Amino acid sequence: MKVAIVPFDYENNKADKMFKRKEIEYAPFRKMYTCFQEIGIEVHTIDVYDSLRNIDWIYFFALNTKWYTSLIWKKCENKMVYVAFEPETVIPFHSDAGIRLMCSYFKYILTWNIEQKKEGKVFLFQVPYFYRKGGNVSLEKENCLLIFQVTNIQTVKKNCTVNAGR
């Protein structure tokens, strides 16, 4: 089986760069690449393939209109899957209305949002997140900004002391 990926930030991630980047944000893609390879699925960014004829699935991690229109012209619409990797706060059209609209453009949609799941068209997937373990850093070494939100301003004025050293 062959899988092609249309990556987000296409220019910086083409030629399989998204699978080789060392930043922690790319850890899910590195893991996806190795897992696919282990079970015999060939996966590359779409620009690596010479021909799209033998590709089984094309995953869009971003809506790239250049590739979308090219693939529609090449009759690949039944191979295209959109992956709504980010929440709607990051990409606004990953909202419920946006996903409903995307259903008319893609054969399948993968989303992390359980409320957007629809039988036969929209499927759930678990987005892995990797965090760096933070250590104990003293406030003297760390530039620190604290925000306090209060609802009763009278209480704050009455009980607040100001640190003049800041």
Question: Model-predicted segments: where are they?
Answer:
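Nucleotide-sugar donor-binding catalytic core of glycosyltransferases
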Residues: 1-166
